[in-house]
Regions:
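An alpha-helix initiation/capping motif
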Residues: 33, 37, 41, 62-69, ...
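C-terminal accessory/binding modules appended to enzymatic or scaffolding proteins
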Residues: 361-422
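Active-site cores that bind ATP or allylic diphosphates and position pyrophosphate for catalysis
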Residues: 61, 82-83, 87-210, 215-222, ...
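Glycine- and acidic
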Residues: 25-29, 176-181, 229, 395-397, ...
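A generic structural signal for well-ordered alpha-helical surface patches
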Residues: 41, 192, 264, 375, ...
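Catalytic adenosine-cofactor/nucleotide-binding cores of aminoacyl-tRNA synthetases and other
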Residues: 189, 201-358, 419-451
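Residue-level signal for inorganic ion chemistry
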Residues: 12, 43, 75, 79, ...
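N-terminal Rossmann-like or analogous alpha/beta NTP/dinucleotide-binding catalytic cores
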Residues: 1-100, 189-203, 243
């Protein structure tokens, strides 16, 4: 599911919650070739991951084809539609004439009876007015006027009797009691055509709100060259759904200078009239900032599960006790993580099995003098009873004073012994993450093999 679709769903969800309405989900699957089971599942998975749950059972549009045809028959009886028997060759010739004359296509069957065409293939077209204008009152764009002379007689039913998108959405929105339609502004022209269908049936036209497109950082239409576009990609890249909701809400809408807000705040503040009409530009740095905020706020147990899944996906099998180790380490290493992938990288060192392999750079830090100093530090650490960050920081500072050196003289080597050269937090954080027995054991493996 494209992030533009995700933002549209989010704005619908926010507006429904804000107004006490219902957030409805309909799968518009009249295009049978594109509407595969996999494509539909992507929509369900994306909405589930984002936490946007529909208030009623999803409706599948194609299953309502009989109802759509019923409405077409009603339009035919009212004189608001007609059967068009033009052959493909005749239609192409009319298109050429229309282009040459600067007008829309008009079928000769618009005001003609079937004559001797009975039995020939036909489509059913809407009989659009040829004069005047159609007004679309839009909550984002304002009043948009369409000259009826520029609106063609759109097809309602294809030659095989299947309904077209523009017909189906009108019928379904009416039957489902939809009062507000919030969607991308690539549908703005459709709003005029759909308004004519509503009017042809004597139905109330819903309130329209057409959202501007999402552009890349350079102002161009968002494309693959700008990076990820699908919700699933952002999930795989380690973004949290609450961060995505917060970020997507800011793409075209905002509340003063507030950058970070809860779902409850967004629901209380959101009004579709406050959406700007200009395209929104993505800013990946802002998304990373938000994701870091939500990672720092998240329940460590939840992060442990998510990070554990990442480790498993990397063929790093978790053993008994690893979850507890991760949960202890995560609060100490998460502050700098912009994504869950970075958080997983930051916890690799706590899952390593002894004896650790040492990188060449890590080995280079362990000269004879440094080894001797770390042995002395190891004995002092063994005597620490309160294995917490504050106590360990104090002990490391005191040790440096006793040695008459700065922490930089032994800190990098200590971190290398504890992590094998893998990324690790500050010294006290690494020690607490590993726990006392594991920390001392790793020191012994390098400094006193066989101890």
């Amino acid at each position: 599911m494209h992030i533009g679709t995700a933002r549209t769903a989010l704005f619908n969800w926010l507006y429904a919650r804000h107004t006490g309405g219902k957030f409805l989900l309909r799968i518009e699957d009249t295009d049978r070739e594109r509407s595969t089971a996999d494509a539909v599942q992507v929509i369900f998975d994306g909405l589930k991951w984002l936490g946007l749950e529909a208030d009623e059972t999803p409706v599948f549009q194609f299953a309502r084809a009989d109802r759509h045809r019923e409405v077409v028959e009603a339009l035919l009886e009212r004189g608001g539609a007609y059967r068009d028997y033009m052959t493909p060759d005749e239609l192409e010739a009319e298109r050429e004439r229309a282009r040459a004359e600067g007008r829309v296509v008009r079928s000769p069957w618009r005001d003609a009876g079937p004559g001797d065409a009975t039995g020939r293939p036909f489509v059913v077209r809407l009989k659009s007015p040829q004069e005047g204008e159609t007004l679309v009152g839009d909550q984002v764009k304002g009043e948009v006027r369409f000259q009826n002379s520029q609106l063609d007689d759109l097809i309602l039913l294809r030659t095989d009797g299947t309904p077209t998108y523009n017909l189906a959405v009108v019928v379904d929105d009416h039957d489902m009691g939809v009062t507000h339609v919030i969607r991308g502004d690539d549908h703005l022209n459709n709003a005029a055509r759909q308004t004519l269908i509503y009017q042809g049936m004597g139905w109330e036209v819903p309130v329209w709100a057409h959202l501007p497109l999402i552009h890349g950082p350079d102002g161009a239409k968002l494309s693959k060259r700008h990076g990820a576009q699908a919700v699933g990609e952002f999930a795989d890249m380690g973004y949290l759904p609450e961060a995505m909701r917060n970020y997507l809400a800011k793409l075209g809408w905002g509340h003063g200078d507030d950058e970070i807000f809860t779902d409850a705040q967004a629901i209380a503040w959101f009004d579709i009239k406050d959406v700007v009409s200009a395209p929104a530009r993505v800013d990946w740095a802002k998304l990373n900032h938000l994701n870091n905020h939500y990672i720092r706020q998240a329940d460590p147990a939840r992060l442990t599960r998510l990070v554990g899944e990442i480790h498993e996906s990397r063929d790093r099998k978790l053993h008994d006790g690893d979850a507890a180790v991760l949960e202890r380490a995560i609060p100490l290493v998460r502050d700098g993580a912009k994504t869950l992938l970075e958080l997983a990288d930051a916890t690799v060192f706590v899952l390593a099995r002894r004896p650790l392999g040492m990188t060449e750079k890590a080995q280079s830090l362990l000269n004879e003098e440094t080894r001797a100093r770390l042995l002395r530090l190891r004995e002092r650490l063994d005597a620490v009873g309160d294995w917490q960050v504050a106590a360990l920081e104090a002990e490391i500072r005191k040790f440096a004073e006793l040695e008459g050196v700065g922490i930089g003289k032994f800190g990098p080597a200590l971190r290398a012994v504890l992590s094998g050269g893998a990324p690790a937090p500050d010294l006290a954080g690494a020690l607490v993450s590993l726990g006392k027995p594991e920390s001392l054991g790793r020191l012994d493996d390098v400094l006193s093999p066989g101890r």
